[in-house]
Amino acid sequence: MTATQMRPIARLSPLVDGVRAAVEHRADWSETALLVAEELRRNLPTPEILTPQQRLGSPESYRSHTLHVEPDGTFSIVGLVWRPGQLTRIHDHITWCAFAVIQGVEHEELFDADLNLIGESDNHVGDVSGFAPPGDIHRVHNTSADTTAISVHVYGTDVTRIGGSARRYYD
């Protein structure tokens, strides 16, 4: 995966404000993920939060674009762009996460601690989910033959400081 640097995006202001309010509840990680997921539902961005160039993705791997980092480091908003066939490695996260699909379809596989497949789903435009460790081992795949998928992820950390959201890779 390749990352690009953050740029200010006024279109994200309602989402940033909503996530900030959700995080200020100081709930546990699972509850925070659900609160943030609700803010994503209420303030679902469009693909235009990314530049036309960013929306193209990369032939090498899915792309990550940091869109906002809260000044106190409590959360980051990231746009992920997946060309057809691109996927993540099986991984888990260092903190809570909420995400929404804003273009295309993302196929998600969920795994238990022994890496047994325990669930899978196709997430379409407008589908929103939130989760927190433990129990967040998954892989995401754009299974489309011809459509780029884009999703917005909110992580409970400053991803620019730590270099990403994954805690471990399993494959």
Predicted regions and their residues:
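N-terminal leader/capping segments at the start of a protein or of a new domain
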Residues: 1-48
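A short glycine-rich, His/Asp/Glu-containing loop-to-beta-strand
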Residues: 53-84, 128
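Conserved short histidine dyad/triad with adjacent acidic residue
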Residues: 78-92, 133-134
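Glycine- and acidic-residue-biased ligand/ion/polar-headgroup-sensing regions
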Residues: 94-109
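A short hydrophobic beta-strand segment most commonly corresponding to one strand
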Residues: 98-100, 146-162
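Short acidic-glycine-tyrosine-enriched beta hairpin
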Residues: 113-138
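Asparagine-centered strand-capping/turn motif at beta-strand->loop junctions
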Residues: 140-144
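Mixed-charge, glycine-accented linear interaction segment located at domain edges/termini
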Residues: 164-167
